[in-house]
Amino acid sequence: VGVDGLAWLKEVKKETGMYVSTEVATSKHVYECLKAGIDILWIGARATANPFAMQEIADALKGVDIPVFVKNPVNPDLELWIGALERINNAGLKRLAAIHRGFSRVASSHPEPADHLRSQPHRW
């Protein structure tokens, strides 16, 4: 939908008073969202996994006070996720949330019953 969708979110905000949020993956997305008055931004798993994309987004957010949700990368790489959060924090943003959506599993020669699930059930 792109930029046209931002107008719809703006209308939702006006009619309901609700906060509106959308995903950003580039600096252009950030600028368009800020221009449209989006209240909360989130960064998806693929952008989180790309330090170059994260730095571009962080640079676009310098001097802005907006909540940012950062989803975990698809693969279980905690340092990559922390690095993404640090880049946003180093740009001056303080209202951050780490959103865990689960990790993909590498194919195994010993498949588990729940291998089709993105977030594996915890084993007690």
Predicted features, each with a name:
Residues 1-4:
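Glycine-rich, proline-tolerant flexible connector loops at the mouths of alpha/beta enzymes
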Residues 12-15, 36, 44, 60, ...:
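Mid-sequence acidic-hydrophobic segments that form the walls
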Residues 12-19, 122-124:
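A structural motif corresponding to the C-terminal end of an alpha-helix
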Residues 16-26, 30, 38-53, 66-78, ...:
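Catalytic beta/alpha-barrel core
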Residues 33:
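Conserved structured catalytic cores and adjacent interaction surfaces
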